[in-house]
Amino acid sequence: MFTINAEVRKEQGKGASRRLRAANKFPAIIYGGKEAPLAVELDHDKVMNMQVKAEFYSEVLTIVVDGKEIKVKAQDVQRHPYKPKLLHIDFVRA
């Protein structure tokens, strides 16, 4: 079981996403279920180490946002074309 700590995004848009990536974080979104979509920011290095394992894409993950645990599955992962960097992940509530 993977547990990822996340923070709610305060800013959105291209410039805000670029600033996140420069700070070694990246944007993600949690959607699905009856709740509204939630934009979050994740630590790049921690998630990069987790996503190397195949289970990251098939098992239910736990994302902790403001002390609240959300069960999710990775739906879509966007990567940089040639650098080993994650650009964005879509999570769907499990």
Swiss-Prot record:
One of its GO terms (biological process) is translation. This is Large ribosomal subunit protein bL25. Belongs to the bacterial ribosomal protein bL25 family. PANTHER family: RIBOSOMAL PROTEIN L25/GLN-TRNA SYNTHETASE, ANTI-CODON-BINDING DOMAIN-CONTAINING PROTEIN, RIBOSOMAL PROTEIN L25_GLN-TRNA SYNTHETASE, ANTI-CODON-BINDING DOMAIN-CONTAINING PROTEIN. Part of the 50S ribosomal subunit; part of the 5S rRNA/L5/L18/L25 subcomplex. Contacts the 5S rRNA. Binds to the 5S rRNA independently of L5 and L18. Keywords: Ribonucleoprotein, Ribosomal protein, RNA-binding, rRNA-binding. GO terms for cellular component: cytosolic large ribosomal subunit. Disulfide bonds: none annotated. Pfam families: Ribosomal_L25p. The keyword rRNA-binding applies. GO terms for molecular function: 5S rRNA binding; structural constituent of ribosome. This is one of the proteins that binds to the 5S RNA in the ribosome where it forms part of the central protuberance. The gene is rplY.
